[in-house]
Curated annotation (Swiss-Prot):
Species the sequence originates in: Pinus thunbergii
Superkingdom field: Eukaryota
Recorded GO CC terms: chloroplast thylakoid membrane; photosystem II
Protein's gene: psbC
Name of the protein in its database record: Photosystem II CP43 reaction center protein
Membrane topology: Multi-pass membrane protein
Amino acid sequence: MKTLYSLRRSYPVETLFNGTIALAGRDQETTGFAWWAGNARLINLSGKLLGAHVAHAGLIVFWAGAMNLFEVAHFVPEKPMYEQGLILLPHLATLGWGVGPGGEIVDTFPYFVSGVLHLISSAVLGFGGIYHALIGPETLEESFPFFGYVWKDRNKMTTILGIHLILLGVGAFLPVLKALYFGGVYDTWAPGGGDVRKITNPTLNPSAIFGYLLKSPFGGEGWIVSVDNLEDVIGGHVWLGSICIFGGIWHILTKPFAWARRAFVWSGEAYLSYSLAALSLFGFIACCFVWFNNTVYPSEFYGPTGPEASQAQAFTFLVRDQRLGASVGSAQGPTGLGKYLMRSPTGEIIFGGETMRFWDLRAPWLEPLRGPNGLDLSKLRKDIQPWQERRSAEYMTHAPLGSLNSVGGVATEINAVNYVSPRSWLSTSHFVLGFFFFVGHLWHAGRARAAAAGFEKGIDRDFEPVLSMTPLN
């Protein structure tokens, strides 16, 4: 009878601060950790920690599947993806599923399949997580020594690192297989406004691939974010996958050298801090990639980049006024510079006006109109295609400059659509997450180094403020 809600609601609420709940191994008295530091109780329980990790993976994959199906259910084929707040379907479309010429979505069934596969996978992971958290052995060392470990066992840790690297390498080869053998990927640069194509000749020249790493991150250089063709993208995945797999084999077969044993802190919290630093770096790179790059993140799905929307505005009005009889090659603007076209400091012909700052934009709808010295005046007069006009007008009104209340667009564009671009969502979220992961890295690295030096064991729990507070009931 006690379990009936009608009876139970009158009983006092017990909190973990009371010490009266008999939860051996889960309360502060028996573990030394308060409720909010729950993960710390699993530091030396490899079986339970495995359960936590598998369950976490299940939550991640469940989100991916559920959000995928949610986006499929809400998708309207007549509207561009970027106007519908989608962040998962653009990734699937970029991989070449369900897409036709010009980025038109011709089939949503592959997206449905993707969502269902992720949901089924999440159920398997969820079951495994619950099993290992509640039923399986607390520690793996006795029953399954291959999966067991001690945090300070340097050789075992680098073996685990090696296994992870091999899995990452296999993952890096998946887009390679899709691009080369399984239908190809979407190429925004394909003639006529983009199409799905197989990448038959990936760039394997190391000077081309590693040249990106040696570029400046600033200005027109743009480090790896400046990649502008799928041959280099897929070739980079071949190199990265190979390096990860060979590096993984190396770390499995070798023991850490003396300099590495001295240089690193070898504890669970130290490994956590290294992982957080890596994820932080990934977040910052992803932020820049999705904001600036329109090859890996095609504008057909993610909307235009900021510079792209600005240049599209200049192009749209050049087209309009040229039709009305303006001499776009010689017309002066209010500052005495060219109204439609001007010269960059190095002599190329570029769009005039405020968009001059984005003169080095490269976009598939604009490149056909360039000559050896910037924009080609005769091409602008004779060769502009209807699809280029349509696309630039669309991009002009969909700049990725939305604020939280969706009042967005280029400030000088009265026709701007009120929406928040997926580029805004993805770049902002990855920057913020990257920043907080970096703070987490500093926090855990500091604690791990202090613990290794022997002068910091965490907060002194005898004087923790919560211990002197009145229980909540």
